[in-house]
């Protein structure tokens, strides 16, 4: 699309016929700045008149042609004859009334202004061509864009980028058919930002006689009998409007008639309101009263009430061309949404009760259920709508009335407050009238609100701190009592344990010596053999002593269950470990408090707790946190150094890491992505390959995550296949089902996949819907309207695609935030588990150390205190959380 222009100056000082030929001299063409030119190309593609559209007429408010360009041409008589219209409708000359003469002038003596020249547009005050585009015309309602074309040639190099952004936003801000006052405010804004455009010429702005309708002329000339405004430049236009701000002409629209009143920003996401059921509170109570008049002890009466409940409400209450009703006469005229799931559940419950046998429910029971339905508006006031509430909640604007957004929001809040205060009284009145005073609703206690206005700030004395001191002293006394009782409990355990001498010695020398008989004393005290040296690669933990190992454990004391745990760890079967860990942890907790070698039991309990969390994360989410894996490997090295054996194929931590890397579910997710990116036969081929892989993997042993991936992948591919093969008349529910399944798939498996086939179907459906709304019309004028509607539908389609892309971006941001939260949880959970178990073992180990019989009381060295963390901790404050969940800047 080339942006060509014409520049040929003729300054005659009046509207008289020029003394010089208009087309005798060659024209000179100016070139816009590169950024401005590219912006105009984008605006032209969106808002140009279609090449096959009828560009020779302007429609009036009645939908009929009100004028034709090139009025002095040879086609005018034929045009009037074809329309069978009176000649007064398309007359060429017209007297300029007094009310319009303040802005407009009579130009009947200058017939060349009404001729099409296919070269340029004219300026009004001086007959000279204006720089404008000549290869196309703007669509109906966007002719005002021609005013800003001459301004583009006056912009300096420094302001080129700013003016480009101004042009890019201009059609979206003003929309189609703006008022003359809106054009005036836009010009003032442009002058403020770009002072160099003040002297720029503008094309003629013409007004239709007797109608508040304006048109910015182009190369087609002026419509017949229309009056040009008394301005030919930006400066004269602003001065003319400024001197007549009180004129009613400023409310006139610039452009031809629109396509009727409608919700401006209605999109496909609002279409569900068309089929939703609504009912006013008055009609609901009236219907329920009629139901209560029926004999509910008979089957016929119950069937009649059932039919009444099934027919409640109306549909098609609101749509794009039909505004939500505005007859608001108290709370009884509010509309209740019956299609809501909460309301539907209550209605279904009553309907089921009506369909049951007569013996199950008496008539009084059914009357109570029906009376309870009268409280639906009071229990669900959030789905009660007035016009203000409906338009505010759905962000809808009627017929480009964007200036009413603030008042709609304010009035919606007023309606909400009124509903919350009056719905309870309506329900009480309904119950009293329908039950003849037998039932009563408990009235809420009124809350008196007082407002105190202080002329001066209230002076208050210094607060007393004695109550804080008293709380501190009481807390200290209670803590001392608890500590004293706990120490007494530990002493009682020591005395009791030392009185028993029933456990034999268990040597760990490594020789083949058999244990001594029960009556003899051991040859040497139990402990670690000096010939057993820990490897250098073992990571030592300062919270455990060197004598806490498997060789120091009395297996007779520990019992068979602990031996089974040791055997399970040696076998390394993750499924068996996952089932045995909860019971083993409870046994280990008992052994920590009542058996010798409690340090080793604490270490095993720590390992099993961390391993259980890791196995659960692996089976459910196919996830293995690096922090959890490192913690498991550290404890495994310590347990291996203390005599616990693991499977030769690898430790449980190694098996989990290998399982994550070779996950069947992850492989299927990648295959699904490859299938979703394809279309046509490639999609079907890749889908068949994926389904074959799923059928082969079903025979193997799978985790819960793998099974979930298989089920979701099979269901998603089946839904997409159904949407591709179904008839176009039944496409909408199947396409919505497939898109919903794809969204659930992305949420479950932390992906952001999109289906090329579904996007193509959605675009095709929107295009077919737009073409279906166009239809066929018998006249050329209606064809122009149809083409205009197609252009509007295409514009709506582009905006919906942009909205869909914005939704995808927001979902990606939500996935990123979720991954960050999961990462923080995976890091903190194993650390907290390790700290809690280790601190419990260290706290309880003090009483279990004295259980060994026959040992003299010697002063034992003070063990190193257990510390869960050695460095400065991270503070999880609201500031950090706010930084994590802060909305990214766009």
Swiss-Prot record:
Catalytic activity: Hydrolyzes a Gly-|-Gly bond at its own C-terminus, commonly in the sequence -Tyr-Xaa-Val-Gly-|-Gly, in the processing of the potyviral polyprotein
Domain of life of the native organism: Viruses
Keywords: Hydrolase, Protease, Thiol protease
UniProt-annotated stretches for the region Disordered: 507-533
Annotated site residue numbers, Cleavage: 255-256
Single GO biological process annotation from the record: proteolysis
Enzyme Commission number(s) of this protein: 3.4.22.45
Short name of any one Pfam family annotated for the protein: TMV_coat
Domain Peptidase C6: 135-255
A single GO molecular function term of this UniProt record: cysteine-type endopeptidase activity
Biased composition (Pro residues): 515-528
Enzyme class per UniProt: hydrolase
PTM section of the record: The viral RNA2 of bymoviruses is expressed as a single polyprotein which undergoes post-translational proteolytic processing resulting in the production of at least two individual proteins. The HC-pro cleaves its C-terminus autocatalytically (Potential).
Record: active site: 143, 215
Similarity annotation: Belongs to the bymoviruses polyprotein 2 family.
Name of this chain's protein: Genome polyprotein 2
Organism of provenance: Barley yellow mosaic virus (strain Japanese II-1) (BaYMV)
């Amino acid at each position: 699309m080339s942006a060509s222009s014409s520049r040929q100056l003729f300054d005659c000082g009046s509207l008289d016929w020029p003394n010089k030929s208009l087309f005798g001299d060659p024209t000179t063409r100016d070139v816009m700045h590169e950024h401005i030119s590219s912006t105009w190309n984008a605006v032209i593609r969106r808002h140009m008149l279609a090449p096959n559209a009828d560009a020779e007429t302007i429609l009036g408010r009645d939908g009929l042609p009100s004028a034709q360009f090139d009025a002095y041409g040879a086609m005018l008589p034929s045009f009037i004859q074809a329309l069978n219209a009176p000649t007064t409708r398309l007359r060429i000359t017209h007297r300029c009334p007094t009310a319009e003469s303040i802005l407009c002038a009579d130009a009947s003596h200058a017939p060349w202004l009404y001729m099409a020249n296919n070269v340029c547009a004219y300026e009004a005050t001086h007959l000279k061509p204006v720089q404008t585009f000549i290869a196309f015309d703007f669509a109906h309602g966007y002719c005002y864009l021609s005013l800003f074309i001459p301004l583009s040639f006056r912009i300096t190099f420094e302001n080129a980028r700013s003016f480009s952004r101004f042009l890019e936003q201009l059609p979206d801000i003003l929309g189609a058919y703006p008022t003359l006052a809106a054009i005036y405010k836009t010009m003032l804004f442009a002058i403020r930002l770009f002072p160099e455009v003040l002297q720029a010429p503008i094309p003629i702005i013409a007004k239709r006689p007797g109608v508040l309708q304006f048109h910015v002329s182009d190369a087609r000339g002026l419509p017949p009998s229309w009056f040009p405004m008394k301005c030919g430049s930006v400066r004269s236009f602003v001065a003319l409007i400024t001197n007549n701000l009180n004129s009613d002409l400023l409310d006139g629209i610039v452009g031809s008639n629109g396509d009727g009143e409608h919700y401006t920003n209605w999109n496909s996401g609002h279409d569900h309101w068309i089929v939703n059921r609504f009912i006013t509170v008055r009609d609901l109570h009236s219907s329920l009263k009629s139901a209560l008049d029926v004999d509910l002890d008979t089957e016929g009466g119950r069937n009649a009430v059932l039919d009444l409940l099934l027919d409640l409400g109306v549909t098609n209450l609101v749509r794009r061309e039909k505004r939500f009703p505005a007859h608001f006469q108290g709370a009884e005229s509010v509309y209740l949404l019956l299609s809501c799931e909460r309301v539907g559940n209550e209605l279904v419950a009553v309907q089921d009760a009506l369909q049951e046998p007569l013996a199950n429910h008496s008539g009084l029971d059914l009357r109570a259920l029906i009376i309870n339905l009268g409280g639906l508006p009071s229990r669900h006031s959030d789905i009660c709508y007035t016009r203000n509430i409906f338009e505010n909640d759905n962000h809808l604007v009627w017929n480009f009335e964007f200036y009413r957004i603030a008042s709609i929001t304010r009035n919606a809040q007023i309606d909400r407050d009124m509903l919350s205060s009056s719905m309870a009284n309506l329900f009480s009145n309904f119950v009293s009238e329908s039950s003849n005073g037998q039932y009563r609703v408990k009235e809420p206690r009124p809350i008196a609100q007082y407002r105190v206005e202080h002329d001066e700030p209230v002076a208050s004395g210094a607060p007393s701190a004695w109550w804080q001191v008293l709380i501190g002293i009481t807390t200290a006394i209670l803590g001392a009592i608890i500590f004293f009782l706990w120490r007494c409990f530990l002493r009682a355990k020591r005395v009791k344990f030392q009185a028993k001498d029933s456990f034999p010695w268990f040597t760990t020398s490594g020789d083949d010596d058999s244990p001594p008989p029960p009556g003899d004393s051991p040859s040497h005290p139990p402990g670690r053999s000096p010939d057993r040296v820990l490897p250098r690669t073992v990571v030592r933990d300062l919270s455990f002593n060197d004598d806490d190992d498997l060789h120091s454990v009395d297996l007779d004391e520990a019992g068979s269950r602990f031996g089974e745990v040791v055997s399970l760890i040696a076998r390394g079967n993750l499924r068996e470990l996952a089932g045995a860990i909860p019971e083993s942890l409870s046994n280990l907790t008992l052994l920590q408090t009542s058996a010798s070698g409690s340090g080793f039991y604490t270490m095993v309990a720590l390992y099993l707790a961390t391993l259980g969390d890791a196995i659960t994360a692996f089976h459910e989410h196919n996830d293995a946190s690096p922090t959890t894996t490192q913690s498991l490997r550290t404890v495994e090295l310590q347990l291996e150094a203390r005599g616990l054996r693991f499977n030769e194929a690898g430790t449980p931590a190694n098996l989990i890491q290998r399982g994550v890397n070779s996950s069947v579910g992850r492989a299927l997710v990648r295959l699904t992505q490859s299938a979703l990116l394809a279309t046509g036969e490639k999609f079907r081929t890749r889908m068949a390959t994926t389904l074959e892989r799923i059928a082969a993997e079903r025979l193997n042993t799978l985790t819960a995550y793998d099974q979930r991936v298989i089920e979701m992948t099979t269901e998603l591919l089946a839904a997409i296949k159904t949407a591709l093969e179904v008839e176009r008349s039944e496409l909408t529910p199947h396409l919505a089902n497939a898109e919903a399944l794809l969204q659930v798939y992305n949420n479950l498996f932390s992906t952001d996949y999109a289906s090329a086939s579904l996007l193509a179907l959605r675009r095709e459906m929107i295009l077919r819907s737009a073409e279906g709304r166009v239809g066929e019309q018998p006249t050329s004028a209606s064809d122009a309207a149809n083409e205009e509607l197609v252009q509007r539908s295409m514009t709506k389609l582009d905006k919906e695609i942009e909205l869909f892309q914005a939704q995808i971006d927001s979902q990606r941001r939500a996935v990123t935030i979720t991954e960050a939260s999961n990462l923080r949880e995976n890091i903190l959970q194993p650390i907290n588990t390790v700290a809690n178990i280790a601190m419990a073992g260290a706290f309880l180990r003090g009483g279990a150390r004295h259980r060994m019989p026959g040992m003299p009381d010697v002063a034992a060295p003070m063990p190193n205190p257990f510390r869960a963390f050695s460095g400065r901790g991270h503070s999880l404050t609201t500031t950090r959380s706010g930084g994590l969940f802060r909305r990214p800047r766009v």
